[in-house]
């Protein structure tokens, strides 16, 4: 199975609004996710109550939500949204 990566327009817009330090940390986290999604620093895990959404950590406060789907023999990893924990997981 081949892993493919893409991003949503919302993710792209949110990424452009990050400060320089967080932007660099995000790029590093994405590169690490592409090469080794199980790396402990990413804290990659499935989001409870969803079928195909996962999260990775950029740093202690910023998260990336990823939608993982399948298409033929490909695993599609869509960078869905990015933001602080409270931004991506609003209080219930």
Regions from the PLM with identified roles:
Residues 1-29:
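Arg/Lys-rich, positively charged N-terminal/basic patches that mediate binding to nucleic acids
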Residues 2-4, 58-92:
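Enriched for short, Lys/Arg-rich terminal
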Residues 6, 13, 37-42, 83-84:
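Residue-level signal for pocket-adjacent positions within structured domains
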Residues 14, 29, 46, 78-81:
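Residue-level recognition of specific faces of alpha-helices
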Residues 23, 27-31, 35-36, 68, ...:
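A short beta-strand-loop micro-motif that forms or neighbors metal/cofactor-
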Residues 31-56:
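A short, surface-exposed loop/turn module that caps and links secondary-structure elements
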